[in-house]
Every structure is written in structure tokens, then in C-alpha cells.
């Protein structure tokens, strides 16, 4: 009797875990930065290579990494399965998701919008056009999502932002931005060109 209960319990545990979405921890090669970027990719438990899935790119905030979103949103796996979505969580370091004109190892606009999207579309069964891609993020990641979505409307069909700043210029000494853009006092034009609010005119109807 005890053996039957034990086997039944183990079978139950196996079934529960087999219904969880798959969480894939990988590294994606960036030719632009000549390094590998850690990423977490979450696929539905009923992932079918014959089907195609929309992809949501989740960008973390300052001080975060590829594990930030899976840690703060414990139900990402459940959502991936329920809504048949693939979630992609890259490590954006403290890059603000720009291509830094000063730091060749911080070219995250190119990485996210080109290299990572290409990797995901090549290795997973995705809806590989803008209608199948969305991007969103928190704080620095919210800024990055807007920055990338506005500048790459051919890649991302939808965007969201939670607490993402749209004008970085009032904060020249904060959050390592000057490591990416240089000192504000000497590089005002660069700062002007890298703030989201000055990209609005690029939005298409």
C-alpha cells in the first residue's frame, strides 16, 4: 500500500513538472561585441516545431541580468504555455540598450534588434516578422524597449514600457549612462540623439 502511494505521488510530481514550460539558459554570440551574451528563453510546454509562436522580448532594468524577469515574474512559464508565447530575456548589462559610440563592447542595439532576433528566429519556430514580435521592459529596460521599437519598426510590431524614462538628459551622472555616451557637458549632441523623446518623429502611422 505504501509503495502504491509512493509511486502515485511520484507519478503526480512527474506530471506536474512535465507540464511546465521549458526554460532554456543559453549564450548568444554577438559579432558586434565579439562576446557571448547570456539569455533565458522560455517556450510553451506544448511547443510544436510545426506551429509558429509570437515572441516577447523582456528587457531588464539597471543592475539586472537575464534572470531578472524570470525571478520577478514567476508565472512566465505558465503564461508562455497558456498563451502560446516564447519569452526571450537577454542580459543587457548596464548598456541602456544603445550602441555606445565610446564602448565597442556595448553594442546592444545591434545585438537585440539584429543578432538576437536572428538567433531566435533561426532556432525556434517563430512568427518571423514584426507582427509576431513585441518588446517591453522595466526602468532601463522600458527605455530600451521604446528606443529599439521606435528605431526598428520593421522588427518590432508592438512595444511596452514600465517606468521607462523617455528623456535621459536630466540625469547625466546617474546609472552609468556617461560610460555609454560620454560626459554630458562635452557630448550634448550625442545625448540629444540617444534620448527616446527625440526619436518620436521616427514613428510611422
Tell where the protein language model's regions lie, with residue ranges.
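Non-catalytic cap/lid and distal C-terminal segments of serine-dependent acyl enzymes
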Residues: 21-205
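Sec-dependent N-terminal signal peptides
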Residues: 6-17
Amino acid at each position: 500500500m505504501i509503495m502504491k502511494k509512493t509511486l502515485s505521488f511520484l507519478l503526480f510530481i512527474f506530471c506536474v513538472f512535465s507540464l511546465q514550460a521549458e526554460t532554456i539558459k543559453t549564450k548568444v554570440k554577438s559579432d558586434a561585441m565579439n562576446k557571448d551574451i547570456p539569455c533565458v528563453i522560455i517556450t510553451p510546454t506544448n511547443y510544436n516545431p510545426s506551429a509558429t509562436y509570437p515572441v516577447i522580448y523582456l528587457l531588464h532594468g539597471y543592475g539586472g541580468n537575464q534572470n531578472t524577469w524570470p525571478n520577478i515574474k514567476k508565472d512566465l512559464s505558465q503564461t508562455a504555455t497558456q498563451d502560446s508565447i516564447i519569452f526571450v530575456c537577454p542580459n543587457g548589462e548596464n548598456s541602456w540598450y544603445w550602441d555606445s559610440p565610446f564602448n565597442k563592447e556595448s553594442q546592444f542595439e545591434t545585438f537585440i534588434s539584429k543578432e538576437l532576433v536572428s538567433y531566435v528566429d533561426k532556432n525556434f519556430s517563430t512568427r518571423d516578422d514584426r507582427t509576431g514580435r513585441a518588446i517591453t521592459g522595466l526602468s532601463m529596460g522600458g527605455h530600451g524597449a521604446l528606443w529599439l521599437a521606435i528605431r526598428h519598426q520593421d522588427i518590432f510590431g508592438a512595444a511596452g514600457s514600465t517606468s521607462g524614462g523617455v528623456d535621459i538628459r536630466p540625469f547625466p551622472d546617474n546609472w552609468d549612462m556617461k560610460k555609454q555616451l560620454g560626459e554630458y557637458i562635452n557630448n550634448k549632441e550625442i545625448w540629444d540623439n540617444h534620448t527616446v523623446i527625440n526619436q518620436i518623429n521616427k514613428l510611422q502611422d
